[in-house]
Amino acid sequence: MELKNSETKINLMRAFAGESQARNRYTFAAGQAKQQKLHVIEAVFTFTANQEKEHAEIFYNHLKELSGETIQIDGGYPVDAAQDMAKLLRMAQHNEFEEFDPVYPAFGATAKEEGFAKVANSFDMISKIEQTHGERFGNLADLLEQGKLFLSDVECGWMCLNCGYVFTGKGAPEKCPVCDHDKGYFIRLSMAPYTGA
């Protein structure tokens, strides 16, 4: 089957549109987190937005042979506008889990049936990434809802995302003693990027 006559063409454009919109929603949410001085959540939304941009580009690149054409799609896309940060995180979690299952597996199955193995592989692998995104947003929402984003029941490491200072205690310090940034920049060391072996 040719891509121009396929359902996969439409699914790729739907996925491109969805990833592009997710990127913008997360960029908007990052700005809101920054206003609320939740810089750790700002960083996670920005980090995830950049990954969504990459997903959009992957799906778009699968459509290159159709350059110059207009692909009509019909789809529903979420409006996630809330002032409550935990609610924004929960909405993001929900949307990511929908892409994980059922949306991208169904798109992948269609691509496979139509003979587009590389496209099917992209949908399958990206669906697993979306699961990770959903889990990440859910973990942060849990901590925020429990009042434990900057507190712990046990001593643990806390890293300042601005300068890298690591503090050990049951909670993040109010201010970083090195760079003077507020506690909104601290993340549990176990959740900090690039710290694993």
Predicted regions and their residues:
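Non-heme di-metal
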Residues: 1-197
